Amino acid sequence: MHPDAQLKAAVKNGFDPNILCQRRLTVVKEPVRTILEKQGTIPADKIVDHVNELRDRAFAVFPYACIGQFSFVELSIAESPYYREMLERVKKGDLLLDLGCAFGQELRQLMFDGAPPTNLYGSDLQQEFLNLGYELFLDQPIFPESQLIAADILDKKSALFVRLQGKLNIVYISLFLHVFDWDKQVTVLENVLDLLAATPGSLIVCRVIACRNQAVLNKTHERMPYYYHDLASWNKLWEEIRTRTSLRLAVDVWEQPDDLVKKHPLPGIYVLGSAIRRH
């Protein structure tokens, strides 16, 4: 079941998506504030209103937590211990995809730090998300539409695979995998491996919602077909993928500090960072 269908099913069962919508911002934090002003040329005194107006309009159509809680202006990619490697590789010509990129906000961070836009790709199921990214950052003249692909990662006949299969060097996946159950996560990650070049050094960097309390995990699985990992299940997932693909994959994991989880209604939630490198 896709995220849209999951949300509709939850609403039908009594879930109120408005609990995901926080109050309007009074301050837009760095680094996105400077990116909006310098790269998107939005006047400094208009930035807060610009972000609030876009959030309200987007949430009315897509009542997702990432929109209601302004996650699209809380950039996190630069906090990854692998960010410097990703940035330098892209500057030297490697191709990077942000999978489930939403408004493409992390790609704008890479661009602001000097990554060539033509080496960056973003993909999301919703074309409207990609369009909203342009409305947020006002940077269409410097970030070609051809770099953003509306596609379903589960569909190997989609434009994403037609254009990029076997060509990518790095795939970044942030707060995306948890909306799938275990089996779908396996399929998503196998498909991601197919998008990557079949060469040593191909890299996946993940930011995953995780949970320390198995009772909370089980309750979440009953409510919606999400799969929130703990460290053991994450390692088990990659053991299964190694077995299924016969690939040599080195998996690094760490706990990544993140303000987002402070707002999460479930106890024991944290962000698990991981990097998976092909050998």
Curated annotation (Swiss-Prot):
Keywords: Methyltransferase, S-adenosyl-L-methionine, Transferase. Its EC number is 2.1.3.-. PANTHER family: METHYLTRANSFERASE AUSD (PTHR35897:SF1). It comes from Aspergillus calidoustus. InterPro entries: Meroterpenoid_MTases (IPR051654), SAM-dependent_MTases_sf (IPR029063). The gene is ausD. S-adenosyl-L-methionine binds at residues 124-125, 152-153, 244. The keyword RNA-binding does not apply. One of its GO terms (molecular function) is methyltransferase activity. Belongs to the class I-like SAM-binding methyltransferase superfamily. Pathway: Secondary metabolite biosynthesis; terpenoid biosynthesis. Transmembrane segments: none annotated. Methyltransferase; part of the gene cluster that mediates the biosynthesis of calidodehydroaustin, a fungal meroterpenoid. The first step of the pathway is the synthesis of 3,5-dimethylorsellinic acid by the polyketide synthase ausA. 3,5-dimethylorsellinic acid is then prenylated by the polyprenyl transferase ausN. Further epoxidation by the FAD-dependent monooxygenase ausM and cyclization by the probable terpene cyclase ausL lead to the formation of protoaustinoid A. GO terms for biological process: methylation; terpenoid biosynthetic process. Homodimer. In A.calidoustus, the austinoid gene cluster lies on a contiguous DNA region, while clusters from E.nidulans and P.brasilianum are split in their respective genomes. Genetic rearrangements provoked variability among the clusters and E.nidulans produces the least number of austionoid derivatives with the end products austinol and dehydroaustinol, while P.brasilianum can produce until acetoxydehydroaustin, and A.calidoustus produces the highest number of identified derivatives. This is Methyltransferase ausD.
